């Protein structure tokens, strides 16, 4: 496992930086165009949620190698208010804002591995992985 890049997310322009960084690393490990699009879309949704609901935070990208298998793991960490009901938040249609409620559940479906840890007042940590 190699830490590749850290990006602070504090403004909407930082979401674009996350998208570009994820795409760049996905290309480097030769993910298919479809898999590149999936992880970039998931990362964009999660960075957007982190900014809107968590007040911003930090994104870390890691290139993974396990034997002959390569992957890209992206961590999202914020110190926001946390998510009181994770199961409810992962349901399609759930939103606490003006969005369509597809962010967390949609992001989960786009990646091979998805982990979410959160508690009220403790912030949120989401980790996604896409394998080649």
List where the protein language model places each region.
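Hydrophobic alpha-helical segments and their boundary regions
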Residues: 19, 32, 43, 71, ...
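Bergerat-fold GHKL ATPase/HATPase_c domain
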Residues: 1-41
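Conserved beta-strand-loop-beta-strand hairpin that lines the nucleotide-binding pocket
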Residues: 1-5, 47-132
């Amino acid at each position: 496992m190699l830490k590749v890049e850290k990006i602070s997310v504090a403004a909407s322009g930082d979401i674009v930086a996350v998208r570009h960084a994820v795409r760049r690393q996905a290309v480097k490990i030769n993910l298919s165009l479809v898999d590149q699009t999936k992880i970039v879309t998931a990362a964009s949704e999660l960075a957007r949620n982190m900014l809107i609901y968590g007040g911003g935070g930090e994104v870390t990208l890691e290139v993974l190698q396990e034997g002959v298998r390569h992957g890209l793991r992206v961590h999202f960490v914020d110190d926001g208010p946390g998510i009181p009901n994770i199961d409810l938040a992962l349901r399609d249609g759930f939103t606490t804002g003006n969005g369509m409620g597809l962010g967390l559940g949609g992001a989960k479906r786009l990646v091979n591995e998805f982990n979410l840890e959160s508690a009220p007042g403790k912030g949120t940590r989401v980790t996604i992985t896409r394998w080649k």
